[in-house]
Design a protein with these regions (language model features):
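Conserved catalytic cores of phosphodiester-cleaving nucleases, focusing on short active-site segments
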Residues: 20, 48-74, 89
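Intrinsic disorder/low-complexity segments
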Residues: 20-22, 38, 47, 76, ...
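Non-catalytic C-terminal interaction segments of nucleic acid-processing enzymes
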Residues: 3-4, 22, 105-163
Length: 163
């Protein structure tokens, strides 16, 4: 039985964000994971932000797309993701029936970096799982580590390993 039909789009997006947060938590080394993070400033927001190595490592950002948003994944959508300072950037697609965005739009204009693609699936029981479909490549990091340190000190993580 699928619960997707009884949930509104905001609930579906929140479930997908949670699945992606859990995926990054399992993939990275002692990450701090944030959902709906105000990164890189209070006026912008990313769906999922993870900072590896207990807040001292690489920055990973994810934009989650659900339903009809998945069908409209375009170069413009990827271009806005490229404006967010992060070492690794991802699109997470929920309800996309295995389709992937055009690979050429996933690369940085200078070729240094590729946006990863995470597919979020719901099984018959309503459980979500995430799978890496396109491996990301490292981007130039256009922010300072002081900015990362300030963010992690000021915001409680959604998921983290406590000492």
């Amino acid at each position: 039985m699928s619960y997707r039909s009884t949930l509104n789009p905001q609930q579906q997006a929140s479930r997908a964000k949670n699945a992606v947060a859990e995926f990054l938590f399992r993939q990275l080394i002692v990450p701090k994971v944030y959902v709906d993070a105000r990164w890189p400033n209070p006026h912008s927001r990313v769906d999922v932000l993870a900072v590896d190595r207990s807040g001292a490592g690489d920055v990973h950002v994810v934009e989650v797309k659900i339903g009809t948003e998945v069908l409209a994944v375009s170069a413009g959508m990827v271009a806005s993701l490229l404006q967010i300072p992060a070492h690794f950037r991802y699109l997470a697609l929920f309800e996309n029936n295995n389709s992937l965005p055009d690979e050429t739009c996933l690369y940085a204009p200078d070729g240094l970096g590729r946006v990863g693609v995470i597919q979020v699936k719901e099984d018959q029981g309503g459980d979500l799982s995430s799978e890496l479909r396109v491996r990301p490549e490292r981007f130039r990091f256009d922010a300072s580590f002081k900015q990362v340190d300030k963010f992690t000190a000021a915001h409680p993580a959604y998921i983290e390993i406590r000492p």
